[in-house]
Amino acid sequence: MVTTIPDQKMQTYTKMNTFKILLWLSMVSMVMMFAGLTSGYIVRQAESNWFVFELPSIFYLSTAFIMLSSGSMYWALASAKKDNKQGLRIGLIITLGLGLAFTFTQFAAWSVLVKEGVFFTGNPSGSFLDVLTGLHLVHLAGGMIYLLYVTTGAIQGKYHSGNLLPLELCSIFWHFLDGLWLYLFIFLLVIR
């Protein structure tokens, strides 16, 4: 059978939709997991021996880094859609740097908490905080690995207005991680 141009476009379209659907399904499962954990946090908080503590101020800096990274990721994708390879590369490198800064500030915040006596095994409130922020950081690490892969591809000139799928997948997941952190941060500020 001879494959025609419309058939090739249809195969490419089907492949794109399959990857995007799988990504969305995985993000829905992550939302369910974090919803369950935050629900558990609220239920457990109502019981005795809940230790109330202030979040380290460095979490605000973490939040700024990850929000800025969302902007640089948006810029990178917009640049790729316009075939601006320089803007794409710079946007992805900035996003990668901000992701590393977010990771560093998360570890710094955990260090502050330990100095204040908030441990994973010390109290349920500390355990929930460590699990929520730690799981987010694990997902962010996965996003950073894929971001590094996409950044390498961008440096090699692989992405342009006609080839955006890996970049789009990376962008969708990165914005999801940003939104998830914002939810967790606000939740931890409001629900003590």
Where are these regions (language model features)?
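...captures the hydrophobic TM-helix bundle architecture rather than a specific catalytic motif
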Residues: 1-192
